Amino acid sequence: PGAETKAFTSYLPDSSLLADNLTPRAAIRQYQDFFTDFDSAKAYEMVDFFRLPADRKLSAMSKGMREKLQVALIMSRNAHVYLLDEPISGVDPAARDVILRAVISRFNPQAVMLLSTHLINDVESIVSTAVFMSAGQVFLTGDADQLRSTYQTSLDGLFRGMYR
């Protein structure tokens, strides 16, 4: 990925890229310096929504709190494409709901979101198109409602059946 791609893509990796000595406030300043499309007011609003202490170091935060901060940062960019790699793995079910609610309520409908996850049941209600992959190869893709209708099961049921 080059500078052009990074200019319109907001990426959440499956592992943190933030230094443990950063605070949410410092991370917001860092993102503001790096990304011209970053909305710091939106980031602070999300930090408040997630009830994150703005001046606590990441090293003193739980995994769920760090995950929420990363989501706040990437969703505070005015990007055209959002890539979220396992955004809710490793956090408890209550935190998953909060994270997904924040993502959906703050998502620009003019943008595209690609979300990779093994937690299909948790994201099924927000998925419009599903792509099932194995060993780096696509083996099934389609409109989520059409897949449910065709296979007479949920996306989670389809996922579980295909990956046995």
PLM feature spans:
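Helical segment within the ABC ATPase nucleotide-binding domain
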Residues: R96-P109
